[in-house]
Amino acid sequence: MIYESTRDINRKLNPSEAILQGLSEEGGLFVLRDLGKNKLDLEKLIGKSYYEVAEAVLRLFVDFSDEEIEKCVEEAYRGKFSHENITPLVELEDGHILELFNGPTSAFKDVGLSLLPQLTKTALTKVEDENDILILTATSGDTGKAALEGFKDVDRTKIMVFYPNDGVSTVQKTQMQTQEGKNTKVCAIHGNFDDAQSGIKELFVDEEFKKELLSKNIKLSS
């Protein structure tokens, strides 16, 4: 199972390495080389719980054992969402609605950002990396709070969220500024979301900065 950079197919990583690195050195995304070849039997998933579906999908993309995948899913969602089905499908008179607001921050981003920290923690163990992971990310709203809440107090991870001081709502700003967790930080910047994003990308290609962090047993990810 190999992941390749979208900007350089010669850059190849295994799934755990791709999870930990985030972006490739030249700014590309890591994509599964055989994406589309692995088939998922959707009929077998009918009637399955969210947890069972999540585990079935993850088996196609990560190099974890079944036990590790099950643990990731359990720790990501159990007791953290207000509905036992996580994303329940609600029937209306003329259709259906998939509810994506049952997470800890009421944002749809909770679905993915509750799982990512567990994947990160497990990947660190798989590759036997002794460094802690520092997540740097920019937000214009919901992503920041969801990421902070997801990574809150997850072992061997730290997260810092940058947001435009005048570019988020009062509610979103308050959510981030009052975030709990020993490993969470937020920082407002002068500028817009693109400025925050560009600043983070510059840090990721700053070899001296990354070298200094590694001297403190910290590795960047996004």
How should these model regions be labeled?
Residues M1-S222:
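PLP-dependent amino-acid enzyme catalytic core
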